[in-house]
Amino acid sequence: MLYHPNDIPDEAVEALRPAYERSSKLYGTPELWIQRCREGTAQLWRSEDGKYWAVTEVYEGTAYGKLLHGLASSGEFCEELVQEGEAWAKEQGCKAAMTGGRRGWEKLFSTMGYKTVAVMLLKEF
């Protein structure tokens, strides 16, 4: 389910914290993600059973026009929630969806029609 910006529960920050802890930490914090959802610049999703949470954002001006970006997710993966997000994105005029993450996501998302298009590299100073 997609939350309206005014209805985002406080528990969302802690529900998304595991995603942050396992992430590259390049895309902000759970607090920032939820702030953006409350401002309407990102979207918060939760599976019907409450075990899977995700944050998305819509990019404009890409090679695809509008594109849905899966920013973060946490909990027990729910393919139905991903499909719900994709359907919503199509309604918004998005022509594609993308996400990033750890290597295991490649196999999982490839079964849903996603393909690997880039590898991210990081060097700390």
Q: For each predicted feature, which ranges?
A:
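Active-site rim helix/loop that mediates acceptor-substrate recognition in acyltransferases
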Residues: 23-42
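Short amphipathic alpha-helix that is part of the acyltransferase structural core
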Residues: 1-28
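Conserved donor-binding loop and adjoining core beta-sheet/short helix segment
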Residues: 38-76, 125
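Acyl-donor binding region in acyl/amide transferases
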Residues: 62-112
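Terminal substrate-recognition subdomain of acyl/acetyltransferases
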Residues: 4-7, 59-60, 100-125
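Short glycine/proline-enriched coil/turn segments at helix->beta-strand junctions
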Residues: 47-51, 93-94, 115-117
